[in-house]
């Protein structure tokens, strides 16, 4: 069977080695005679898995001891509301930096829950010579008392990534759903990090929360118990039955990432993949990208064909060539190639080859 390369933005492809291991032990995990999906989440065997998963993630991301690591339900959208309910209380205020579709969605959820009086926002994307560019504000010049400032360093729909470190007088809450573990970051700069698992961690249904201990002392609102960070900490992420199979696969992904050299190693590969694809786009008038070079996403490369009437043919022929899920988000159209950690370099080489051949054929 010819290789199939899945460029889906999420749920995304998982490392082949992880999928094969899961396949091999699907019916008999860890010598238990049953699947990991079938054992109790409170069994000593599964507890050992969860402890190892947390230890591996802490090692990979260099998470300080004063941070809690939570494995929760709800994905990124679930965390949009959890952040508000856990930190704002009845009269707290927050600032949302808007750089694309996902930060806009987080803002909308915060406004719905807390109201405009408690939520401020700043649009941080401008047009530079017709291209989208991020301009980070000097937050120290803002005279306000915020419980936190929220931002999304990588916008999957818009193909925008913020590489500069955000400097803030208030705790930083970051949606790292699409960029977690793709490059090294300093966790100690953040009050809270959250990430839906379905891009760089595992299957959908699980979200990772990394929260600094002092954040848990902020006033909270009455909310669903399963989204209460304090309860999650108190019960080791097991206040209720967690998504055990997703947790298991996340643990396997962490182990895989460690085996190939960790985040520093995969970051070099990710940079190489993105540079290769952007070079193909830039060297060919048949394709175009709408983001300044300094803010082009390494995880989600968006591009358009010069002749949009060829979009359907491009996708059809790409599918035949084993290059799937390249259609851009319905909001922006065009194409999108998601290059998460599990995407091998060979997949990008195959995509670039196809794009060059398609351009030569239809130019």
Curated annotation (Swiss-Prot):
The modification N6-(pyridoxal phosphate)lysine is found at residue 199. GO terms for biological process: L-serine biosynthetic process; pyridoxine biosynthetic process. Binds 1 pyridoxal phosphate per subunit. Pfam families: Aminotran_5 (PF00266). Its cofactor is pyridoxal 5'-phosphate. Pathway: Amino-acid biosynthesis; L-serine biosynthesis; L-serine from 3-phospho-D-glycerate: step 2/3; Cofactor biosynthesis; pyridoxine 5'-phosphate biosynthesis; pyridoxine 5'-phosphate from D-erythrose 4-phosphate: step 3/5. Keywords: Amino-acid biosynthesis, Aminotransferase, Cytoplasm, Pyridoxal phosphate, Pyridoxine biosynthesis, Serine biosynthesis, Transferase. Its EC number is 2.6.1.52. It catalyses: O-phospho-L-serine + 2-oxoglutarate = 3-phosphooxypyruvate + L-glutamate; 4-(phosphooxy)-L-threonine + 2-oxoglutarate = (R)-3-hydroxy-2-oxo-4-phosphooxybutanoate + L-glutamate. It is found in: Cytoplasm. GO terms for molecular function: O-phospho-L-serine:2-oxoglutarate aminotransferase activity; pyridoxal phosphate binding. L-glutamate binds at residue 42. Its main location: cytoplasm. One of its GO terms (cellular component) is cytoplasm. Pyridoxal 5'-phosphate binds at residues 76-77, 102, 156, 175, 198, 240-241. Catalyzes the reversible conversion of 3-phosphohydroxypyruvate to phosphoserine and of 3-hydroxy-2-oxo-4-phosphonooxybutanoate to phosphohydroxythreonine. Homodimer. Belongs to the class-V pyridoxal-phosphate-dependent aminotransferase family. SerC subfamily. This is Phosphoserine aminotransferase. The lineage of its organism: Bacteria, Pseudomonadati, Pseudomonadota, Gammaproteobacteria, Alteromonadales.
